[in-house]
Amino acid sequence: MKQTYITLNNGTKIPQFGMGVFMVPAGDETKNACLEALKLGYRHIDTAHAYQNERSVGEAVRESGIPREEIWVTSKLWPSEYGEGKTMEGIDKMLVRLDIGYIDLLLLHQQVGDYMGAWKDMEKAVAQGKVRAIGLSNFESDRLEEVIAAAEIKPAVLQVELHPYFQQNALKERVAPYGTVLEAWYPLGHGDSGLLNEPVFTQLAKK
């Protein structure tokens, strides 16, 4: 698998294709799935505190034999960890769970709680070298605007549901002036066969 990369607004390059481990059980199942993905050429793994499998992702990264700087790891903070001071504690605990030195991309998972205080701590974590890039997940409308307006470091990534049935064009235009990249979850739809059976995709697949 040949990787392509997208340059974020802070100059770092994120692998365009990644493997998410949402709902993958912690332990060998997550670790082996990540190791196989890395073997096939993936260089981006997406996890979260809420997934409860960060330790297994970290084990796969360490055991892969691939240089750390070649693997991009995204994780997400849950709202229970939001708040100035509290978020930094959450980041430090995440670093222990992953045990890979630093986090490539850290996202706020949901737009509830003290996300403004959390953002301040995330900016500090970037300055301290704990995190390379920061962004948001599932933020929209007024709360997205609130973070953008106050942020010293503009979100590098906004991760949202995004696929051919739900293209989020207005949201993409809204964040474009800040260089914020939209990142898709559910890129192939909701796991059913509807999207993949669309004639345009089946015709492309045959080519």
Task: Name each model-derived stretch.
Residues 42, 100-103, 131, 155:
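A structural motif
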Residues 87-107, 124-128, 180:
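CE4/NodB-like, metal-dependent polysaccharide N-deacetylase domain
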Residues 68-81, 102-111, 138:
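A short, structured active-site edge motif that brings together acidic residues
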Residues 1-71, 188:
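N-terminal binding-site loop/beta-alpha segment at the start of enzyme catalytic domains
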Residues 25-38, 82-99, 117, 142-146, ...:
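Short, acidic/polar
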Residues 110-207:
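Beta/alpha (TIM)-barrel catalytic core signal, keyed to glycine-rich beta->alpha loops juxtaposed to Asp/Glu
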Residues 19, 37, 45, 57, ...:
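Conserved, mostly hydrophobic/aromatic
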